[in-house]
Amino acid sequence: MNEELLTVDEVADILRTTPNTIYRWLRAGKLPGVKIGKEWRIRRETLELKLSETNTVIIKDQSLLDNIHPQHDHVMAVTRNTNNLYNLEAEFFKKGLSRGSRLFKGCWWQHPDDVRQELSLRGLPIEELEGKNSLTIVDLTHQYNRSGKNGPIQIWSDEARKTLELGYKTMWGSGSPHLLSCGGHFPNLVDFESSLEDVIRKLPVVGICPYIFETIKDDCFSQLINLMNHHRSVIFYNDGLATYLKNEPA
């Protein structure tokens, strides 16, 4: 049986990105392809499998995201793996776009180019959004290493201000730190989240902080509770099941 091979341009059209991005993914091995002479080809079956792994509807009850305040919120999300985390971020950003908001993505352990790829595979036109300044992606670890907690917090504030200057009313942003993102010390992370909560409550920002907890036991349980106390609500998400809890931070 003959396999259908797609050109780079065809794949770029399907994923709503540019051919240069597809070439970059192919060279990095992030998208499987075959070389025919000097030209790349991607098997349709391979592309469909990749899309089926990442472009699923992750929240069965879409009204769950409607619980997030459309203009001011600071939400913690608890996930089990990177695939769930990217799924949740993608749906969060789609909800923000549907409400006419500007998007902000802060990277801690994630590489910005990986974020672009993963969100593109989940149906977001990343290059188009970045080209219009409707989305900005920033390396927050670099900002933290340079300026401590004030670096990432200042980025959140600056992007919120820029959002208003561009004519938007609200910025929807996602951070997704790791438990050891802030210099390898959990207390530093708690201090950062507490300070971010103080700043976000004064800005037209809907912020979500997705975390990965592969297991919740012993120290992880106390860390989870500690972080929850610095967010106004919490989403628990795992493989298509999600629960939203309203929280009153301590």
Regions found by a protein language model. Name each.
Residues N2-L5, D9-K30, V34, K38-E48, ...:
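Non-catalytic regulatory/interaction regions at protein termini and inter-domain linkers
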